[in-house]
Amino acid sequence: MNTPQISLYEPGTILTVGSHHAKIIKYLTSGGFAQVYTAEISPPDPYSNANIACLKRVIVPHKQGLNTLRAEVDAMKLLRNNKHVVSYIDSHAARSVNGIAYEVFVLMEFCERGGLIDFMNTRLQNRLQESEILEIMSQTVQGITAMHALQPPLIHRDIKIENVLISHDGLYKVCDFGSVSGVIRPPRNTQEFNYVQHDILTNTTAQYRSPEMIDLYRGLPIDEKSDIWALGVFLYKICYYTTPFEKSGEAGILHARYQYPSFPQYSDRLKNLIRLMLMEAPSQRPNICQVLEEVSRLQNKPCPIRNFYLLRAMNQNANTQLAGEPSSTTYVPTQKFIPVQSLQSINQPPNMMPVTHVSTTPNLGTFPISINDNNKTEVTAHAGLQVGSHSNLTSPLMKTKSVPLSDEFASLYYKELHPFQKSQTFKSVESFQSPQRKSMPPLSLTPVNNDIFDRVSAINRPNNYVDSETQTIDNMAVPNLKLSPTITSKSLSSTKEIAAPDNINGSKIVRSLSSKLKKVITGESRGNSPIKSRQNTGDSIRSAFGKLRHGFTGNSVNNSRSASFDNNNVNGNGNNTNRRLVSSSTSSFPKFNSDTKRKEESDKNQRLEKRRSMPPSILSDFDQHERNNSRTGSRDYYRSHSPVKKTQASAKTTSKPTLIPDNGNVNINQEKKESIQRRVHNLLKSSDDPVTYKSASGYGKYTDIGTETSNRHSSVRITPITEEKFKKTLKDGVLDIKTKSNGKDKSRPPRPPPKPLHLRTEIQKIRNFSRLQSKKLPIERISSEATETIVDVNVDDLEADFRKRFPSKV
C-alpha cells in the first residue's frame, strides 16, 4: 500500500500525547512511515527533569501494523530509566484525520548532540582513537545488556551506527526498538519459513545480519547471539568506517570471511574482540556480559554490570537447595581458572574465577560472583550450598545452547595475542562438555561428595592390577603386585593357583628348575628326551610341556594350574603353602655362582657322553619314557594319530620289546604293539635310503624345461655334447635346436647373405675381424628351447675374466 500523504506539523502545533501536552518546536527528519519532531512537553520528564522531548509520529496504514508499534512501545517501557537506552516518556494512538489510517505518537528522550554517525562524520580525517572506540562500545553494550537481561530476553535485531544517539552530556544511547522481538525458533514448515524470512528482510539491515539470519536452512534460532554478531559489525565500522562484509556480501557473512584494513591501526586485543564476536557458529560467540567484561578490561576499568547469567544460576541453585530437591553434585574445579588481575605477586595466591559454561536460564549451579569497587572479583559460597552442574545449557525460551567465554576469549584476561596472530579459531561448543581436572581452586567451599573423588581417581588409575590393601583414598598408590615371569598370561586369565613347594630357598629353586629344564630339553639319555624322535607325532611336545609344568609347579602334570593372590597372608612365612606374589626391586632368584656353573658344566658333559654311548633306538627311548611317566598319554595319542594304516602282523617282525605298564593303569594289546613296532621299523628303513641331492641346474633365465618322466630329483637333464656334434655346430655356424614335445629337429630358415663391405659400419667390421681372429662362435642369445646344447666355452678365459671383474670374490 502506498504511503499516505500527510502534511508536516507546523511549529507551535499543540498535541495531546497520553498525559502530556506537546508543543511542536521543530521538524527534524522523516523516514518511511515516521516523522520526528522536537517538542516542549508539560509536565517535564520526571527521569531527566527536561521539558524538551522528541516526538515520533508514525503513520500505520492498517490495523495490523498497530501490533508492531505496540511491541516497540512495550519494549521501551521495559527499558525505561536506563541511561544507555533512549528513555520512554509517553505514547498515544488514534485514527488519522482522513480516517484511512492510524497515527501513533511516541514521546521519548531528546538527544541534543544527534546521532553517532554525525559524530563520526566530523572525524573523517582524524579517525577515532582506541579509547574513544572503547567508550562508545562500552556504553552501547550496556544498553543492549539491559535488553538481554530481561526474562525472556529481547533481541534488538537492528543494531547499527544509525541507531545510537548522543545525549547532551555525551552519553551514547541505543534507540529504534521497532525491530525488537523475542527469541525466534527455527521454522519447522514452509509457512513458518516464509514468515521468518519476510520478517528478517523487513526489520533488519543487510550488512548487520548474522549467518543464521541469512541461511535459515541451518536450523539455528535467532537469539542474543545474533545481536552479538551485529555488535561485532558495529565495532568494526566505528574502527574502520566500513563494514567487514562491504565487498564480499552475503558469501562473506555466511563463512565469516573478512580482513582488517591496514589503516588505522588498533591493538590486537581489540581485533581479537571483533573476531570473537564475528564467529560463524553462534555457540562460539561470547554472550553480552562477556563482551562488556572484555571491553572493561581493555579500558582498565571495572565492569559496570554484574554478570546476570551467573546471578541467575546462583539464585536457582540456592532455591533448589532450600526446597530440598536433589541436585547432582559435581567436581567444580574441572573448569579452567583464569586470574582476574594480570599483575599479582608470585608469593601471594591470586584471585581466581572459574569460567563456567552458563546459559541465560537459571539452570546451572555455580559460584555467586560479585565485582566490588576495587575491580576484584569476589567468589562467595553460602552456607550449605553445594555447587551443582547441569548438562542442559539452554538459552531462555528456545532451549538452545548459549556458551559463554571460550578458552581463547578467556585468555584475554591476562595476556595479549601475538601481533601476527589474527586468525585464531575458536573451539566448538562440544569441547566444553568434559574438561579435565587441573587443580583445586584456592576457595573455601562446602564439602563435595566423596563419590566425586572416587570417580576422578578411577579415571587416572593405572590399568595394571593394584591390590586393594595397597590402594588408599588419599594418594594414588603405585602397584606393588607384579606377576612372576614364569606365570603365563593364560594361567593368569584363568585365575588358578600355582602352589609353590615348601622349604625351598633361592639356590634350590635355581638348581631344580635348571636341571628340570635341561632334562626336558636335552635329556640325560636319548631315552629320557621326549622331543627327540625323528617323527614327532605331537605328543612328545605335549609331554615336554608337561615336564616343564611339573618342574615349575612341583606337582603332577595332570594337576590343575592356577594363580592365587592371597591378600591376607602378607607375613611371608616359609611354611605357607599359598604365597602372595610380591614384586621387589631385586630379582626373585639369586644369581648363579661359580660352583653352580661348574656343576652344570660337568653334568652337561656327562649327559653328552651317555648320549654318545647309547644306540639310537627310538623304541627304547619310547619305552623308557613311558616307564618314567605313564600319565603323559603319548602311547594312545601316537596310535590314534599315526599315518601308517593297520595291517596284518607279519612273520618277519623283528625284536618285540615289551612295554611294562605302571600300576596296571595301561593294558597293552599285542596286536597294537606289533603294529607300533612295524611302523617304527618302516620309518627306520625308509631313513636308510640314500639322500637325494637337488641342484640348481636348469634355472637359467631363458631355460624352459618340459615335464620329465624320470624319477630323478633334478629338475634339468643336460645331454652331454659329443665331438661330432660340436664340430658340426662349428661348421654350420648354427645351433641345432631340438624340441621335446615332438622329438623332431626344427630347421631354421637359410641364413641371409652377408652385408656388403661398403654398407657395413665400423663396429660390425671390428666384430667380424675379432671373430675371425678368435675363431669363436658369434655372440647370440640361446633360445629357451636350446637346453640340450652346450656352447663351446673357454673355461680359462672365463676364469680370467671373472678374476678381473670380481677381484674381491677370488
UniProtKB/Swiss-Prot annotation:
<feature type="modified residue" description="Phosphoserine">
    <location>
        <position position="556"/>
    </location>
</feature>
<keyword id="KW-0547">Nucleotide-binding</keyword>
<keyword id="KW-0597">Phosphoprotein</keyword>
<protein>
    <recommendedName>
        <fullName>Actin-regulating kinase PRK1</fullName>
        <ecNumber>2.7.11.1</ecNumber>
    </recommendedName>
</protein>
<feature type="region of interest" description="Disordered">
    <location>
        <begin position="552"/>
        <end position="668"/>
    </location>
</feature>
<dbReference type="GO" id="GO:0000147">
    <property type="term" value="P:actin cortical patch assembly"/>
</dbReference>
<dbReference type="Pfam" id="PF00069">
    <property type="entry name" value="Pkinase"/>
</dbReference>
<dbReference type="GO" id="GO:0106310">
    <property type="term" value="F:protein serine kinase activity"/>
</dbReference>
<feature type="compositionally biased region" description="Basic and acidic residues">
    <location>
        <begin position="733"/>
        <end position="748"/>
    </location>
</feature>
<feature type="modified residue" description="Phosphoserine">
    <location>
        <position position="484"/>
    </location>
</feature>
<keyword id="KW-0067">ATP-binding</keyword>
<feature type="modified residue" description="Phosphoserine">
    <location>
        <position position="428"/>
    </location>
</feature>
<comment type="subunit">
    <text>Interacts with ABP1, which is required for proper actin patch localization.</text>
</comment>
<dbReference type="GO" id="GO:0007015">
    <property type="term" value="P:actin filament organization"/>
</dbReference>
<dbReference type="InterPro" id="IPR011009">
    <property type="entry name" value="Kinase-like_dom_sf"/>
</dbReference>
<dbReference type="GO" id="GO:0005524">
    <property type="term" value="F:ATP binding"/>
</dbReference>
<dbReference type="GO" id="GO:0031333">
    <property type="term" value="P:negative regulation of protein-containing complex assembly"/>
</dbReference>
<feature type="compositionally biased region" description="Basic and acidic residues">
    <location>
        <begin position="622"/>
        <end position="639"/>
    </location>
</feature>
<comment type="function">
    <text>Protein kinase involved in the regulation of actin cytoskeleton organization and endocytosis. Phosphorylates PAN1 which disrupts the interaction between PAN1 and END3, and between PAN1 and SLA1. Phosphorylates SCD5. Preferentially, phosphorylates substrates on threonine residues in a [L/I/V/M]-x-x-[Q/N/T/S]-x-T-G motif.</text>
</comment>
<dbReference type="GO" id="GO:0030479">
    <property type="term" value="C:actin cortical patch"/>
</dbReference>
<feature type="compositionally biased region" description="Polar residues">
    <location>
        <begin position="553"/>
        <end position="566"/>
    </location>
</feature>
<feature type="binding site">
    <location>
        <position position="56"/>
    </location>
    <ligand>
        <name>ATP</name>
    </ligand>
</feature>
<feature type="binding site">
    <location>
        <begin position="28"/>
        <end position="36"/>
    </location>
    <ligand>
        <name>ATP</name>
    </ligand>
</feature>
<dbReference type="GO" id="GO:0005737">
    <property type="term" value="C:cytoplasm"/>
</dbReference>
<feature type="compositionally biased region" description="Low complexity">
    <location>
        <begin position="567"/>
        <end position="588"/>
    </location>
</feature>
<keyword id="KW-0723">Serine/threonine-protein kinase</keyword>
<feature type="region of interest" description="Interaction with SH3 domain of ABP1">
    <location>
        <begin position="743"/>
        <end position="756"/>
    </location>
</feature>
<feature type="modified residue" description="Phosphothreonine">
    <location>
        <position position="553"/>
    </location>
</feature>
<dbReference type="GO" id="GO:1900186">
    <property type="term" value="P:negative regulation of clathrin-dependent endocytosis"/>
</dbReference>
<feature type="region of interest" description="Disordered">
    <location>
        <begin position="733"/>
        <end position="761"/>
    </location>
</feature>
<comment type="similarity">
    <text>Belongs to the protein kinase superfamily. Ser/Thr protein kinase family.</text>
</comment>
<dbReference type="GO" id="GO:0004672">
    <property type="term" value="F:protein kinase activity"/>
</dbReference>
<keyword id="KW-0418">Kinase</keyword>
<dbReference type="GO" id="GO:0043332">
    <property type="term" value="C:mating projection tip"/>
</dbReference>
<feature type="compositionally biased region" description="Basic and acidic residues">
    <location>
        <begin position="594"/>
        <end position="612"/>
    </location>
</feature>
<feature type="domain" description="Protein kinase">
    <location>
        <begin position="22"/>
        <end position="298"/>
    </location>
</feature>
<keyword id="KW-0808">Transferase</keyword>
<dbReference type="GO" id="GO:0120133">
    <property type="term" value="P:negative regulation of actin cortical patch assembly"/>
</dbReference>
<feature type="modified residue" description="Phosphoserine">
    <location>
        <position position="402"/>
    </location>
</feature>
<keyword id="KW-0963">Cytoplasm</keyword>
<dbReference type="InterPro" id="IPR008271">
    <property type="entry name" value="Ser/Thr_kinase_AS"/>
</dbReference>
<dbReference type="GO" id="GO:0004674">
    <property type="term" value="F:protein serine/threonine kinase activity"/>
</dbReference>
